[in-house]
Amino acid sequence: MNEDALFKVLKRQTKATLLELLDSAYYEMNTQQRRHIFGALMEESKPAKAIAREIKKESEEFYQESIAGIYYAPFAMNSKNFSHIPEETEEWFEKLGDLLQASTQVAKQKEHKSAVESFEILYQLIEKMECGEEIIFADEYGSWMIPGNEQDFLDAYISSLADVKTPEEYTKVVIPLLKRDSYTSFCNKVYSLAVKHSSKAQESTLKAAVKEQKIKTTSRR
């Protein structure tokens, strides 16, 4: 297709026609192409108000689909294609990132109970992915592939936990997040976030558990 001729035709189209073409083009793209074309635009956009019950429902559906293997797309790997990442894997991370971002917005709206419910579902799923369950497929994959800033997601999650959980409940949820952070050189500073958002009672219970279980909270380097 001749590029110059195409753009001359496009310049003569109405806004409605261009939007219709853009809509069609979006659905012809794969996940990576959409991120490349529209990613910067989405980062600049203001987040829309999230409907908490819808986010929870979407998170539950995404969890069930993932467990059922909807996004698991294995292929015969060899020396030529080992770096290939299936579209299903790309789509899974994109959907996960969208739901984490939406849950963060729910937390910012001070709907902390609903935010916690969604975050708990998503982080259970992340744990299963990191443990190697057959949810997605690639030679190498991990949480670094989640779009967005995970520290922001965790900040929202932990702040909501602090608002709705007892000291014992708070500690029970935060401890696995602390251990997970230690595996990634404390890149998300989970302990600092947990102390920042906790009440005195929550902080005391958490610190006692950290000491008892001898959990590292910062890098020694």
Task: Identify the role of each PLM range.
Residues 13:
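Residue-level signal for short amphipathic helical patches enriched in basic/charged
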Residues 4-8, 16, 23, 27-221:
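Eukaryote-biased, non-catalytic alpha-solenoid scaffold regions
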